[in-house]
């Protein structure tokens, strides 16, 4: 384990003493260090009647137990302090470590022995081997009462609200959209779990079209075969209009009553970060949105109608929209428990909705935590003039997603009444998708949140993985740079795939978010500020560094690609084409081994480099015909240890999100030997070689100069490493699978790779 502590806040000594005293650690500034440590430990072991016993089973050094040490005349030393501290954090002395000073350096332990009271205060705010901070572990065990009131420690809310006796209710928010054109505003179901409290509390809201269930069967039927010819497009300039949103006004009157009438029973799934915040005094709201089970309207996936309906839930929390008790719209209930302040959470589609919500500039949305979210839907299902698939999901497109998330069809009555209209709406969507050309058009323009990024007022926290080929890193990169300069923005850029990171051992992500939300939603005045970029170092396990920016580098490193012309044959023998189509993983493996139709260029790294931003290929290229698809991947090549893209379980169900509440696994990205690691990749239709909105002819056998930017990333390379650039046509995981007989030729002498460093 390595410690990477971003959540700790330096407080004045008087605050430290006051907070310790409130938790029963009655330490005196004038006492000697040894006496203070004993006083601290006897309170620490509050679950024991006889505190001599737990002291006797800890060690001060290799020859002395802690009780014997306190009974001796020996002085407290730095070595003894560290030895005791590591044991309190769950490490076994003489098993996990023998020399505390060596272990301190190996783990990056954040505490330097000096002022013992401040050392002990920081120790309580340090994560244990099992994933909780020490203070959270003690509170979970009953250190302070579960009194349904707020208690703070180091600028973070503690788990002092009951998660057993909570209010569970359902309301139906009246949106300002009418997606199915029935003349009534769509209703959106809101599932609420909130702690009991006499005052007003903030809300953690997860906007998830998946939450009420998914129609996997219908979605699978809607998948496309990726086999087909790359379209030869007519040259033209793509014209667009400013997206419009038509809102509807509330209709009719409704009796105001005191409480919701529908009780929330079981929910499909909760998000463990939300579980963590519930006993800390934050309401949990789950909203599936229009076109989902128990709500009304069509599934408009990603457009501002869908976003508006989610926004209206925040409006209700602030008294600007109504919520009914049921679908009759006869009785309404106010969110009189809400303080109006909201943070959004969730990954993938959930993080996408956070991005969209932020761009409305809605009052009350204080923080978004957008994890692996889409910023422009075109870049999810298309790329540079190509029809593409999200990584791992060949054949998926917008209409199959619509079938997946239109969960109203899971209710037989809704299916009978509404499926015909839903299918008619879906046909309109299919016509607008334009799978023929893969070009950007008005449909995608209406689902581009970057256009409204200037409206964002909330503080923004992103998480994204360098190995996320589902929602590719371009999404967070573009959103990060589109945000107004005056707002606070932060990015956790890890080396995983499309995964959550809130339960990783190596970083105090949950505690950092706690510090942020306690400040922004609960009004605690602290100096807490996350770095702009927190990056997981790819060269070592469990190592995180603070950076000033994602991209924006002034210096570049250029690699020449060769001295000759090389060709990429597009067509495969039928046997290989069929084999790759059945299992794209086989294609990826053989591509990395140099066995596919490809140009492979190994580039020695002659000095340490820190890539930060978008690698760019400048290529002199020609096609043997009037079309061309170019794929590129940049690998770090060579057998060595690399971080793996998916977290592994270190310890099952050891993280306590409250008090014996929603225990979850402690995880981390493994660091294992592999033959290579993907650094970045990209795909380009050569007819869109100069601009996404400009379609140009390709003249057979005529040279073209192409500037091709790959996916943004942050990656460290060391002198002696090897980069492998792979150029090819069809990618059997991502692109259309065109097996026509043509080839691309690259003049390597007139081509180069540029890395921003």
Swiss-Prot record:
Its EC number is 3.4.14.11. Pfam families: Peptidase_S15 (PF02129), PepX_C (PF08530), PepX_N (PF09168). InterPro entries: AB_hydrolase_fold, Galactose-bd-like_sf, Pept_S15_Xpro, PepX_N_dom, PepX_N_dom_sf, Xaa-Pro-like_dom, Xaa-Pro_dipept_C, Xaa-Pro_dipeptidyl-ppase/CocE. The active site is at residues 348, 468, 498. It catalyses: Hydrolyzes Xaa-Pro-|- bonds to release unblocked, N-terminal dipeptides from substrates including Ala-Pro-|-p-nitroanilide and (sequentially) Tyr-Pro-|-Phe-Pro-|-Gly-Pro-|-Ile. It is found in: Cytoplasm. Signal peptide: none annotated. Keywords: Aminopeptidase, Cytoplasm, Hydrolase, Protease, Serine protease. GO terms for molecular function: aminopeptidase activity; dipeptidyl-peptidase activity; serine-type peptidase activity. Its main location: cytoplasm. It is an enzyme of class 3 (hydrolase). It comes from the Bacteria. The keyword Mitochondrion does not apply. GO terms for biological process: proteolysis. GO terms for cellular component: cytoplasm. Belongs to the peptidase S15 family. PANTHER family: COCE_NOND FAMILY, PUTATIVE (AFU_ORTHOLOGUE AFUA_7G00600)-RELATED, PEPTIDASE S9 PROLYL OLIGOPEPTIDASE. Removes N-terminal dipeptides sequentially from polypeptides having unsubstituted N-termini provided that the penultimate residue is proline. Homodimer. This is Xaa-Pro dipeptidyl-peptidase. The gene is pepX.
